């Protein structure tokens, strides 16, 4: 690889388990559910996994469960409303549900990939913390898989790594990895 060619390692992380991922009678904000105690342990494990990665740019969805997960990696992060979950939008008063088709979500994911690839070109590590349904579309967009071709499982607190290089095809280097959760999860995985 030449020094002048673009090389980007993109890490995609789904937030830890949230109240919206479990069955509960406890009241919570359905649009912006907080992490469960288990989700907080998962977020901590994600932070520990990335502790050795010294140079990176961290992006997070503005929703609390993603920001809380991202904050375990670094307190310095870029909040990007394009990373919101499918069917959620930011308003002056917080967040609200609205209809967003899979195709519209995929178009938003393509926009995010284009933005990241144009902004981060020189041997960079970029970490995105977001949501299951959006990451499903983002992974497909990054790999040039059409929107409706397949549905991917994205576990809570999982890591997917995609490498971009000027002179090679996009590489799915790691998919839905939860090896850092062995202490916290055992067999308990939630996907969407």
Where are these regions (language model features)?
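Short beta-strand scaffold positions
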Residues: 60-61, 107, 129-130
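Phosphate-handling substructures
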Residues: 33-34, 71-116, 171-176, 191-192
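Domain-level recognition of soluble alpha/beta enzyme cores
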Residues: 146-171
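Glycine-rich phosphate-binding loop signature in dinucleotide/nucleotide-binding domains
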Residues: 51-54, 116-124
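Active-site-proximal alpha-helix that buttresses catalytic centers in soluble enzyme cores
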Residues: 2-76, 97
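GST superfamily/GST-like fold recognition
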Residues: 132-136, 171
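Conserved histidine-centered catalytic loops in small-molecule metabolism enzymes
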Residues: 53-81, 163-192
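Generic beta-sheet signal
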Residues: 10, 56, 122-132
